[in-house]
Amino acid sequence: MNKYIFDCIDAHTCGNPVRLILSKKPDLAGSSMSQKRSDFIKNFDWIRKSLMFEPRGHDIMSGGMIFPPNDPNNDFSILFLETSGCLPMCGHGTIGIVTIALEENLIKPKVDGILNIEVPAGNIIVKYEKKGSKVLWVEIVNVDSYLAAKNLFV
């Protein structure tokens, strides 16, 4: 049996848990976060299940991993993980992960107060205010909504 030790930081956003996975991140195939998400689901979903479900997580556990950006104009990218799956976008996860990353100096923003982040759903803009080592607030400009399909019959 293989043994793995993952370094994580746990936090919460208004009581909802968020876990940032720091170590043992897989090398994901793809040139976009959507493609990398697909690779994670296909080949590494055991990581999500191990860290989000009992006994290490619980039914509303949410979290993710930070990766370098695919586009150098962006600050970084996020892969969202939770008990329901590997999500294309998660507002709660974004707020928690950004707060952890800023307060722990895990990221260096290109512009103070603004982060350009790649997520599987597309690119998001995050605005924030930091005073000393604490993040005071986080605001998300989400991806545009779109029509994924029409005239479907169930």
Model feature map: region roles:
Residues 1-152:
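A glycine-rich beta-to-alpha transition motif near the start of alpha/beta enzyme domains, typified by
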